[in-house]
Amino acid sequence: METDALFDAWERAWSGRDPDAFAAVCDPEDVHYEDPLTAAPLESPEAIGAHAGRLWEGFKDARLQKTGPRLVGPDGHAAAPAKLLATHTAELYGLTPTGRFIIVHGVTVAQVRDGRLHRIRMFFDLYDAATQLGVPPRPGTMGEKALLMLRGFGFKREPKP
């Protein structure tokens, strides 16, 4: 499969709510997947499908959309920018549903081998997603300043003369 079509299929797999869809795009014998929510690498299309299933449980309308051109290197590595659009409608990782709609930008970096994704890393800002869900205080608010003070970062201090 050509790389652009492969990433289109990858995005459809994340958007389609069919955990078996990852088998068509991932190397069935030797896949390695990581993102900020995986505690350890996932090493089968079935494991990636189960991981996506947890996302679909909490965000029933989750969809991944292309946001720019895919970059393909001569060595089989490729990158695909995308955004996740979703509404938090059910419990996920212990977080009760907020009903909030989020947009999380990210990029998938992968090694393509024999027309399939082999080594895959999805990068996205987990803190931004949590902020959109209302978990931590929004940047620049008094809540954030109070939290930073409690964590020991405090306000800027004037240097001693």
Predicted regions and their residues:
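C-terminal and inter-domain tail/linker signature
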Residues: 1-161
